Amino acid sequence: TNDEIIQQILYYLLLNDANPGKRLQAVSLLETVPAHNNKKLVLISSVLSETNTGVRLRALDLLSQFETDKTIRDACLKILLEDQNEAVRMGALSILANSPSADIVPALRVVSLMDQNEYIRERAVEVMTDISYLAEDQALEVIQ
């Protein structure tokens, strides 16, 4: 939906409505809103502050459609290290895995050792391995 007023109402509902069902409906409707910075920031705010797991998962899903910049990466690292819900942590790790960079390795090390979920620990190791291969490839390109 391109109507600016409707977008603002959806943002407001997602971040402020007391009813989790309405927040879930708002985040679902945001799928039709074009990707731009306001939408990204509202989704990040929702995923970091939302109490309802379904809303957080849906917001993360929509965030995964954005190019992973520092703001999204930082939010996903916070989620990965602090969120109580395994599915939400998996979603954050998935976003990080799609845009691997060396600056996430320290957090991935912690997750690979400390996360209570075996799959998340193993996936963190896989992402670190991918990052080390990327670093080797980049070093080879520099040498050549």
Where are these regions (language model features)?
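Short inter-helical turns and helix N-cap capping residues of alpha-solenoid HEAT/ARM repeat scaffolds
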Residues: 18-19, 51-52, 84-85, 116-117
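Amphipathic alpha-helical scaffolding segments comprising HEAT/armadillo-like alpha-solenoid repeats
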Residues: 3-14, 36-47, 69-80, 101-113, ...
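Structural detector for internal amphipathic alpha-helices that build alpha-solenoid repeat scaffolds
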Residues: 1-3, 12-13, 21-35, 45-46, ...
